[in-house]
């Protein structure tokens, strides 16, 4: 089996690509499977790993437009990646679950109505960057 990336008239064997690029290509392959052969659920742990922030945005957009799955669960620590889900979160297309180890219930779904005012001028990633108590994020 031989796979390569063709871009701008050049061919690159997968072995010569970065880990992040290979992961991105494999996820894009999964996201673009025909619906009838697709998955009922896609779970991805830290899809932003080894990716430039610009590629993280591309990956987020591809996940949002993906039609090869019915549900998608993503675990991330990247505010840049999280930024891209703000509008879909506000519109009710995306739910965000926060891990809070200090709580009796460590998994909590964010309430979009509770964050609506803050998200007028900020993104989910912004709130993560400043360690907003509702969303958690970077330690203070």
What residue ranges belong to the model's regions?
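Switch/communication elements of ASCE P-loop NTPase nucleotide-binding domains
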Residues: 2-139
């Amino acid at each position: 089996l031989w796979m390569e990336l063709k871009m701008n008239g050049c061919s690159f064997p997968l072995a010569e690509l970065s880990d992040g690029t290979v992961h991105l290509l494999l996820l894009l392959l999964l996201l673009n499977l025909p619906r009838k052969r697709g998955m009922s659920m896609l779970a991805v742990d830290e899809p932003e790993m080894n990716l430039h922030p610009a590629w993280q945005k591309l990956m987020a957009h591809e996940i949002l437009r993906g039609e090869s799955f019915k549900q998608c669960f993503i675990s991330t620590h990247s505010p840049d990646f999280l930024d891209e889900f703000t509008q879909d979160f506000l519109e009710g297309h995306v739910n965000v679950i926060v891990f809070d180890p200090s709580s009796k219930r460590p998994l909590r779904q964010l309430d979009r109505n509770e964050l609506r005012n803050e998200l007028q001028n900020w993104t989910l990633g912004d709130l993560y960057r400043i360690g907003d108590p509702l969303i958690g994020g970077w330690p203070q």
